[in-house]
Amino acid sequence: MKKYTILIPIYNDRESLTKLIENINEELNGLNAEVSILVINDASSQQIIDTYPNLENIHSFEIINMKQNRGHARCIASGLKYIYEKKKFDYVIPMDGD
């Protein structure tokens, strides 16, 4: 089974992130793959929801909170570094949170 990690940088867009997570979970129904989601919170001033119920098609969900706002590209770079050091995967899918 292939292992995918979806990398989502986010800044002050809680509603879009919630919809995106739910849509990803729905689209994965019946797919023979192990999919994890890693959200990089770019020091949002909004509270980012860190628990989503009923994510039966998503293997793991994790949020990394940046200490200060560093921008979209820096979030992706930080996320990729984390994934390469900490995760076992076959593919990484960077995806905007909005």
Residues covered by each model-derived region:
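Hydrophobic targeting segments
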Residues: 2-8, 17, 24, 35-40
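Hydrophobic/aromatic residues located in beta-strands of well-ordered beta-sheets
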Residues: 37-39, 63, 92
